[in-house]
């Protein structure tokens, strides 16, 4: 490989890393780069590799590699590289550098939350998010610059909109931005580049056919195995909406193969059955098909247990509606995923406690229930999941199009209803995506300065961090090194305590401002 493979695939340094074995802890990459020294970067965001070739990769990047090889490109011509060791891989024969991005400019939800976390705690925010810095570091890597004359840079992944919507793809000299599912048009694009043909600056790939999606060759970070693609609930702001109705992969010949790759080659002991909505595996429409979900769970459980009793399965996403629609299914699945006294995390896009917002922007999220029932559904679903040993990681979005103060009050009311449940409530700033992607970017400071929105953000973060503290042991559980696990646990515990205390002080200030405003309004009405 002295002259380099024709295609080198990589990702932002923060995205490429397994973060010491705990992908849940990867949120640290959203911190400003001035908080992360080169020593911390190498320690926390290192990528296990052999002569620059990554041992594991982000799932999406593993899929890109598999698609290229499946399309007929030679295995020797495609390599997934550690972004910190590109000099060992890129050579004179390299013609394409493909970069997978999750947050190339630091405009994602995670970066927005981190900004609020630091700002409300009175901590300085300088520079750009580390994850964005790790992307820019690839572009200025000496080996990339050395071979730039003959090298086309292609950027893809779920956050490419950040580049195209801001025009930074041109400013940064990126040759091609690929948007959409890679399997649909990606292999043809790469072949055109290798054959010296002219290609567009932006390529829009549609939803791929299920039969055109191959199984991964390189193991995935976090033991991720995709069991479905798409969602079909039709939320206006959501990228999975662009993939259309939910499509389920067969267990035999697809899911089982990826489980084996992750266990046998990746040495992974926990398999994450990834889906935008796990409990709708096998569904043809909105309603779940419980027998198919239970059958999948049993098969996956049986397969991983064939490698040893300490091998486990987990999943990552659900909606509130499907849990309430079929609670018996949830209980049966939990017997396998959360066997014994095991607890795991599961994510839920709550998004809003306002039936008006739900009806206007994401009516499908409540189906088969009505938007008016949605707050009740959220509360009930989290209770069911807690009863089955899931800690829910819930998101609630601010600054959605058409949002009013009444909608924020509904959010606060829902937050109050959730205070005794195990749910980590992250407040998210609206970021343009999907059908709404061309709206202006969220102004984070403006939301903090608004007393009502500032109060909601602060209350949501207090709840989120309090639950995170209680679940900190679970968050670091998959870290490989017990000493590292102990260090991260204790540092995290200290930081969370400090930040929560600062937030309570801030909340008192918001309450003072709100009370003063109410008194002024009463006085005005009296006069």
Labelled PLM ranges:
Residues 60, 79-213:
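Glycine-rich beta-alpha loop elements in corrinoid/cobalamin-binding modules
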Residues 3, 16-24, 188-225, 270:
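N-terminal [4Fe-4S]-dependent radical SAM core
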């Amino acid at each position: 490989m002295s002259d380099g493979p024709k295609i080198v695939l990589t990702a932002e340094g923060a995205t490429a890393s397994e973060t010491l074995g705990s992908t849940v802890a990867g949120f640290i990459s959203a911190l400003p780069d001035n908080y992360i020294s080169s020593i911390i970067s190498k320690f926390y965001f290192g990528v296990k590799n052999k002569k620059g070739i990554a041992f594991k990769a982000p799932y999406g990047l593993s899929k890109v590699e598999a698609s290229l090889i499946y399309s007929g490109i030679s295995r020797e011509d495609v390599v997934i590289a550690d972004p910190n060791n590109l000099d060992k891989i890129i050579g004179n024969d390299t013609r394409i550098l493909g970069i997978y991005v999750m947050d190339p400019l630091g405009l994602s939800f995670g970066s927005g939350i981190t900004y609020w976390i630091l700002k409300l705690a009175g901590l300085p925010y300088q520079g750009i998010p580390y994850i964005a810095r790790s992307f820019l570091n690839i572009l200025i890597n000496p080996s990339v610059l050395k071979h730039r004359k003959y090298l086309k840079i292609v950027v893809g992944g779920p956050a490419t909109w950040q580049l195209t919507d801001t025009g930074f793809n041109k400013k940064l000299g990126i040759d091609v931005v690929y948007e959409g599912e890679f399997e649909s048009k990606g292999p043809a694009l790469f072949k055109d580049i290798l054959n010296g043909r002219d290609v567009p600056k932006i390529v829009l790939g549609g939803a791929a056919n299920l039969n055109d999606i191959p199984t991964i060759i390189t193991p995935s970070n976090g033991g991720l195995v995709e069991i479905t693609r798409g969602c079909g609930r039709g939320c206006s702001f959501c990228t999975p909406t662009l993939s259309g109705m939910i499509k389920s992969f067969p267990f035999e010949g697809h899911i089982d193969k990826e489980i084996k790759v992750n266990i046998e080659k990746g040495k992974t002991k926990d398999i994450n059955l990834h889906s935008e909505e796990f409990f709708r595996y096998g569904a043809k429409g909105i309603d779940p098909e419980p027998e198919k979900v239970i059958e999948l769970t049993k098969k996956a459980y049986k397969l991983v247990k064939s490698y040893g009793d300490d091998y486990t399965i987990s999943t990552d996403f659900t909606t509130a509606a499907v849990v309430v629609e079929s609670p018996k299914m949830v209980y049966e699945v939990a017997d396998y995923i959360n066997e014994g006294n095991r607890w795991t995390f599961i994510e839920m896009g709550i998004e809003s406690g306002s039936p008006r917002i739900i009806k206007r922007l994401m009516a499908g999220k409540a189906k088969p229930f009505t938007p008016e029932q949605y707050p009740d559904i959220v509360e009930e679903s989290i209770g069911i999941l807690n009863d089955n040993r899931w800690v829910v990681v819930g998101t609630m979005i601010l600054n959605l199009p058409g949002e009013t103060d009444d909608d924020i009050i509904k959010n606060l009311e829902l937050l109050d209803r959730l205070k005794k449940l195990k749910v980590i409530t992250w407040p998210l700033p609206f970021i343009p995506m999907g059908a709404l992607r061309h709206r202006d970017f969220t102004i984070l400071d403006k939301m903090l300065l608004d007393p009502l929105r500032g109060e909601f953000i602060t209350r949501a973060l207090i709840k989120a961090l309090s639950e995170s503290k209680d679940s900190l042991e679970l968050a670091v559980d998959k870290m490989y090194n017990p000493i590292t696990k102990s260090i991260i646990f204790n540092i995290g515990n200290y930081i969370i305590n400090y930040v929560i205390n600062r937030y309570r002080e801030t909340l008192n200030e918001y309450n003072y401002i709100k009370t003063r405003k109410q008194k002024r309004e009463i006085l005005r009405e009296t006069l």
